[in-house]
Amino acid sequence: MEHFFSLLVRSIFVDNMIFAFFLGMCSYLAVSKNVKTALGLGIAVTFVLVVTLPVNYLLQTKVLAADGILGIDLSFLSFILFIAVIAAIVQLVEMIVERFSPSLYASLGIFLPLIAVNCAIMGASLFMQQRITLSPSDAKYIGDIWDSISYALGSGIGWLLAIVGLAAIREKMAYSYVPAPLKGLGITFITVGLMAMAFMCFSGLNI
């Protein structure tokens, strides 16, 4: 249980997908103009992560690994199978959002189906694949399906916090004076840089 919470906290603050690895930046910058829309996308990304990572973990350890049920090393297929799982889950999320929240579906536009190619989702699966091979004494080690869920949930929450935080700041900046050369993406990149520097203070935590 201690390792479960350690993975959760580390993936939110220390190994944040946005501020530590710069993954998922396209939708992060494009959909962070409104807090409500950013929150909706953040929840969708978190849901996709929490569902896809355990499925991909089971695929990697029980099917693709040399000691899996097939007895053949099929790890070379992991990339394409991970993408297939992610695409299927994103399609499910898109159908659910369109059914229960048409306004959110309309505001997210093309960025909802693009979750399927959000590098934060694929990156989390590849990091998970890498962490399976680490020593059990390593704080980043993923040894069972619960560890994969913890890592997925933390990665999703970290991404959600990052996009909602930026959206809140950008909403305030809309009513603030910004020099003409910095308007738009200029001031946004500066803001993201300052937020990343703030998250760097967690990098020394030994969790």
Describe the function of each predicted region.
Residues 22-30, 94-100, 111-112, 119-138:
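Generic transmembrane alpha-helix signature in multi-pass membrane proteins
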Residues 61-108:
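Ordered, amphipathic secondary-structure segments that act as subunit-interaction surfaces
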Residues 171-189:
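Interfacial loop-to-transmembrane junctions
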Residues 23-27, 45-51, 83-92, 117-124, ...:
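Hydrophobic core segments of alpha-helical transmembrane domains in multi-pass membrane transport
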Residues 23-37, 90-104, 166-177:
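C-terminal ends of transmembrane helices
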Residues 6-47:
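Juxtamembrane transmembrane-helix termini in multi-pass membrane transport proteins
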Residues 6-20, 72-86, 149-162:
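Structural signature of hydrophobic alpha-helical transmembrane segments
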Residues 37-47, 77-82, 104-115, 181-187:
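Cytoplasmic-side transmembrane-helix entry/capping segments in multi-pass membrane proteins
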